[in-house]
Amino acid sequence: EGGVKVIDINTLGVLYVMNNTEKVTVSSFEDLRGKTVYCPAQNPTFLFKAVCEANGLKVGEDIVIDNTYAQPADLRTALASGMVDIAVLPEPMVTIAKSANASLSASIDLTKEWEKHYPENSLMQGCVVVRTQFLEQYPDTVKAFLNEYKASIEFVNANPTVQRRLDKFIGK
């Protein structure tokens, strides 16, 4: 039907509600009532809005979702510097923010909230796609890529020294 096909799902839920524990306490969605939560634009906002509403919070009335910092890296910086008190962030931004500011906490795991309210739908956050035409023309090449892709993931996971060197490139 479409021009691309998903050939691997590589990232499930990685989104968290984070808060500055010195300024605000957040342990449930009810704690977000009356608050402004900063959220990266697009998918994180759509997901967060759905989970807010599933938890009884009407966006625009009970809670404000602010997309001022549309990019996760910009929002991470704003949260870590204290310009923002509550934010939705993905990994690895969560870890980076926490390493910059010890007062930050990943207080709500949005994957767990999603699974609680939408158990029939997995929260996929990342995948590998291929153009359908390429897949049909070069199935052996795609299969070889997937085998190498899997082997590279297994190698990195089995070698913490390599992981640490790669972390420098992704900002951890």
Predicted feature residues:
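Pocket-lining segment of extracytoplasmic ligand-binding domains
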Residues: 68-167
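Acidic/histidine-enriched active-site and ligand-binding environments that engage anionic O-linkages
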Residues: 168-172
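Short, glycine-/small- and polar/acidic-enriched structural segments
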Residues: 1-68, 85-91, 107
